[in-house]
């Protein structure tokens, strides 16, 4: 079978499509025929060697994939069953989805919900799954459509744009924050009530500003997150899942101790299985068919290295899917 294999030579990461034997696959109780995978930012860092993502070589990248069970030694899965996988260190320290087959632990897999195709699952991918977890965090924090307006930062990205669509589908009034004015019309099509320029949130202000938002999903971090915290309603919840703008948090405790604001971290990598299943079930039912018509490009395994480099150079728009095996 074919796989994109990363090897290291003289400190450089080399990526090429190789033929490997099924016996070379890592340990696991379920073998999956991979239909679709994707090129995420973390994949791009791994494939190009620009980030210290991979510490053990050789490695097959691909942090998410969707496909069909080929063989199972676990009672929860049967041959022919469609499945999806995100996270768990797959594609980082366990061979991932950029191969015609993947062998993984059964408790890492989620049965593909009815109504969702493998291709649609990978249009959503890790970003869509993370967005759903963020929405669930707001709900668990008591934020409802009646609570008031909610805001999403980094709305042009995969997590942010999906969060806008999900919140709109659930009846929330959504404001999107974006640094790309050319995406404003697209964000409004997804359901954003208004789109604000990221620059409005990039400068430090007072410890407490006028209360504007009942809830927030932040994918940016740093000053944008700090500014949002100063603008939250009393008792509001902020779900933070990203660091596109940096890892710092130049904030004060004032929003927490005077406005009872809750800052909820959201991690998608180690999310327990039951919560994963609930998130994917809701993703399959909430989003309209038009969501899956968004800008995507489909590539082959051989095109993955060049595409990874282009993604890091901001030359890629939309989601990149890798057609690995049989496609729907």
Residue locations for each model-derived region?
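Glycine-rich beta-strand-centered segment in the early N-terminal region that forms part
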Residues: 23-39, 50-90
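Glycine-rich NAD(P) Rossmann-fold beta1-alpha1 loop
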Residues: 128-129, 154-161, 221
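Residue-level marker of beta-strand positions
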Residues: 64, 81-82, 101, 149, ...
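Short, glycine/polar-rich helix-capping loops at beta-to-alpha or helix-loop-helix junctions
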Residues: 98, 179-186, 247-253
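NAD(P)H dinucleotide-binding glycine-rich loop of Rossmann-like/cofactor-binding domains
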Residues: 86-151
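C-terminal hydrophobic helical "lid"/dimerization subdomain
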Residues: 274-328
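Glycine-rich phosphate-binding loop and adjacent beta-alpha segment
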Residues: 223-289, 324-328
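Adenosine-nucleotide cofactor-binding segment
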Residues: 168-224, 281
